[in-house]
Amino acid sequence: LIENDLSLEHRKKINDFITLKSKDTLWSKFVLMLGIQMKTGLDPNIIVSIENKDIDETNRSIKLPNKLISFSKPNDDDLWDSIMERKSNSKYLFYRTRIQFYPRYKYSLEVDQDLDLPTSPEFFKRRFKQMKSVLNL
């Protein structure tokens, strides 16, 4: 989804967006998925299917069927820390959730839907489209 020939301006906008939205309830899951995609070039279908059992905390890596992805470089620290924060007792790193809004309190919360099912690839595509609109890309 991210073209290799993105202009530097677009890359900067996306990197700033990732930094700004990494703790935002609505965007944090997508932003982590996007960060993994930008580092690895993995297809969103593969990213949503990452299982927690394949995350090696000791070696700072994720084992995929045909690939081992290392997060051992110093500039990977923020991304790895976010992966560790996201990791849980669920089967998948990105399991099914929904956002519950409380307009009266101007508050939103990510609510678990199914710990045994991965987030759909459509979630990534939908949020990617929203991000492009927000950033005027």
Task: Give short role names for the model-derived ranges.
Residues N4, L8-P44:
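Basic, Lys/Arg- and aromatic-enriched nucleic-acid-binding interface segment
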Residues N4-D5, I69-K73, L135:
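Helix-turn-helix-type domain boundary/helix-start signal
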Residues T19-L26, T40, D114, E122-L137:
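Short, basic (Lys/Arg/His-rich) helix/loop patches that form interaction surfaces
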Residues Q37-N59:
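Short, charged phosphate-coordinating catalytic segments
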Residues I50, S82, R86, R127, ...:
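Residues in the recognition helix of alpha-helical DNA-binding motifs
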Residues T58, K63-L117:
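Basic, alpha-helical nucleic-acid-contacting "clamp/cap" segments
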